[in-house]
Each structure stands twice: as C-alpha cells, then as structure tokens.
C-alpha cells in the first residue's frame, strides 16, 4: 500500500504552460496542422489587406477633387468606421465560433446516424443469412442464399444527401442580426450625421460640413450590406472557408475602383459619386456571398423558435464591452498625444498606424485558430486543440519577430515617406524602438484573441480586457503627463503586454476551457 501511494505521489503533474512550446521544432513544418492553418490564414489575411489597399486608391481619386473634399471624406470615414467597429467585431467573432461549433456537431450527428444505419443493416443481413442457412423448410436447399440486393435508390439518395443543404441555426440568426444592426446603423448615421460631424470638430461654418454630410449620409445606406456581408463572412469562416470571402472582397474592391473615376469625374458627381461607388460595391459583395452561401445552407430556418438570439445577445454584450475598452485605450492615447501639440500628434498618428499594421497579418492566424479550435472543442479532440493552439501562437510570435525587424528598419530609413517635417521625423525616431520591439507582443495578443474565441471563452476575454483597460488608462494619463511622447508609448507597451499576459493566462494555468490540460494524466488513475 505504501509503495503504491509513493508511486502515485511521484506521478508528474502536467504543466499547462509548457503546451505553448509543444512541437516547437515543427513551427515551419508543412504537416497536416500547418497546412490547415495556413490554408485558412493566408486567404483571410489577403482579404483583410485588400480593403485598406482599395481605400488608398479611393482616397487618391477623392484627393484630386481638392483638400476640402479629401478632409471631408476622411472625417466621414472615421465616423462610419467607428460606428461599424462597435458591432462588426462582436458579430463576426461570435458567428465564426457558433457556426463552427454547430456545423461540427451536425456533422458528428450525421456520422453517428450513418454508423447506426450501417450497423443495423449488417445485423439484418447476418440475421437473414442465418435464417436462410438454418431453415429446414427451405424450398431449395441446393441454391445458396444470396444477401439482399443493394438498394440502388438508397445509394442514389445517399449521393444526393452529400450535396444536401445544411440547416445551421446560428447562421440564420447571424444574418438576421447583421441586417437589423445594419439598418439601425444606417438610420442612426443618416439622422445624426451633422451632430456627429460637430463632435468630430467640423464647425457649422466649415466648408467641410456640406460635402462631409452628403458623403456620410450616402455611405450610411451601405451599412445594411456591410453588416450582412460581414455576418456571412463569419459564417464562411465557421465553415473554415476563407477563399470565398476573399473572392467576394476582391471583386467588390475592383468594382469600387472601376466605378470611382466614372462617378467622380465622368458623371461629375464628385464626392457624392465616390460614396455611391462604395455603396454599390458593398451590395455586390453581399450578393456574391449570399449566392455562394445559399448553395450550402438553408438560409430560412424550419422554425423561427430555433434561432439563437439570446445566445448572440448575451455573448455579444460581453464582446461589445471588450471592444469599447480596446477602442477607449487607443482613443485616449491619441487624445493625450494631441494635447502635446500638432507635431507630437502627427508623429504619434503615423507611429500608431504602423504599430497596428501587424494586426492585419496576425488576424489571419487568429481567424484560422478560432475556426479550427471551435470545431476541435466541439469534437472534444483535445490533442488537436493543443496542437493547433500551440502552432498558431508559435507562428504568431515568429511573424512578430519578422515584423519587428521589417518595421524597425522600414521606419528608420523610410520615415521621410510619411513626413518631411524634421520635428515629426525626430519624434518618430524616438518611437521606433517601442514600435519595433513590441511587434512580437502585439502578434501574440492578436492571435490569442482568436485562440480564446475558438474556446468560446467570451466572458473571460471581456472581463480581462476591461481590467487591462482600467490599468492602461491610468498608465496613459500618468505617463503622458510625466514623460510626454515617450510616456504614451511606454503606456501602450504596458497595455499590449497586459493583453498578451491575460490572453495566455487561461491556457498557461489550465483553467476555464483549458482544464483538460491539467487533468490529462489523472484520467488514467481515476
């Protein structure tokens, strides 16, 4: 008894934190895990990068109209994007996880039903054979008993079932919510555009007011298409399909680029033409995604009561709080930089945009991690969960190291591309060490968002982000007052470091959805 007790006492307990380094030497391996991650991440990253590129071209066309029109479009887009960001992030994140989970569960049910059906047919055939062989009253004992002929109709039915549309309740729910949120956003922006422009500093007598009001009001008409298309992108991500959204995004951006000069210059609609071109492209993207999705999914659920509005609302409010916390930290940092003067603000804005560029690349890994992990958690395939989670984090960190070198050298030698002002360039040089050195931290923080969303750990991510924001807000205010421009970047470094630490805490401690990391060795002894 004593020896057995000693043996049990000496069993090594697993250390959850070490799972992060699982198969580290295979981080660049093109194995099944690596191919699956990159197959989702690469198209997702391209789709995310396509919009900013199209926006730059769009801005170039508007810039030819004059400085007033360009400024009007800039402030209008800032308002539109800020209003959209609040709803887009929760909607897309929840849709991806929920659809991946439900789709996986439905596939598991289908496989179980098929297995049960095959088992029942096998028993029936065996029973028929036994009866045929053992029956003494058989009319023709010389002829061997043949098993029942296969049902060709059944086989053809099975082939058609493979192409049968799926009923995914969360997909239908997400689309309805996307349309409703888009309509609400459109109405809000149309009727409050002048008020919002005033809040952004556009005065009643400003020459920007009229063109900005017209542009924002027309762009608002595209909000329903934008939110609905993003809901459908979340659905495709849940199916682990990021190529279809990439195709739709590229087509829409090309349409926008082609229509811009036609509406702006040929039809002489000016800034209004730019807005119309963008709205048309949004509706084209929605139509493309809708057509592809209609081939896969029954968009109208059999029963309205099957829709999961409550689940979306509960978790959506949590992610809304998280989004507000993230936005507030970055907005406060910009506000503190603005208080330092025009030159520090200009340098800060350039540095901030470069600092956050890594999110476009890492969001691709985050999307891949979220989709695969949501499926794996639904299957309770914890070996795959650990393999995928560790791999995307390792890939994110390596990508961050590469970005650190690229961004550091790029800003050092290419600062003149962003500004010709020596004072601005000098302040940018001060910020370069922070921007470059924090790229691996940023990468981990962004990828961890996808990992935690894949685990459906929405409550933790929301509450932890609010806590991070509270500390970071205090740090931004204090450091900006005491250390000026450098202080703001120190505070932002603290902010991203806290995001990464809290993001990895659940996995590293084996808590929440990651409890299985601690209980793996104990299962054998129980």
Swiss-Prot record:
Organism from which the protein derives: Arabidopsis thaliana
Keyword tags: Cell membrane, Ion channel, Ion transport, Membrane, Transmembrane, Transmembrane helix, Transport
PANTHER family xref list: PROTEIN DETOXIFICATION 43, PROTEIN DETOXIFICATION 44, CHLOROPLASTIC-RELATED
CDD domains: MATE_DinF_like
Name listed for the protein in its UniProt record: Protein DETOXIFICATION 43
Domain of life: Eukaryota
Induction section of the entry: Two-fold induction by iron deficiency. Not induced by aluminum. Induced by abscisic acid (ABA).
Region named Disordered: 133-166
Topology in membrane: Multi-pass membrane protein
Cytoplasmic topology ranges: 1-36, 81-170, 237-244, 294-316, 375-396, 448-457, 506-526
Taxon lineage: Eukaryota, Viridiplantae, Streptophyta, Embryophyta, Tracheophyta
GO biological process: cellular response to phosphate starvation; intracellular iron ion homeostasis; metal ion transport; response to abscisic acid
Protein role: Citrate transporter responsible for loading citrate into xylem tissues, which helps facilitate iron transport to shoots. Mediates the citrate release in the apoplastic spaces during plant development allowing iron nutrition between symplastically disconnected tissues.
Molecular-function GO term, any one: xenobiotic transmembrane transporter activity
Location in the cell: Cell membrane
Polar residues composition-biased segments: 134-144
Transmembrane segment boundaries: 37-57, 60-80, 171-191, 216-236, 245-267, 271-293, 317-337, 354-374, 397-417, 427-447, 458-478, 485-505
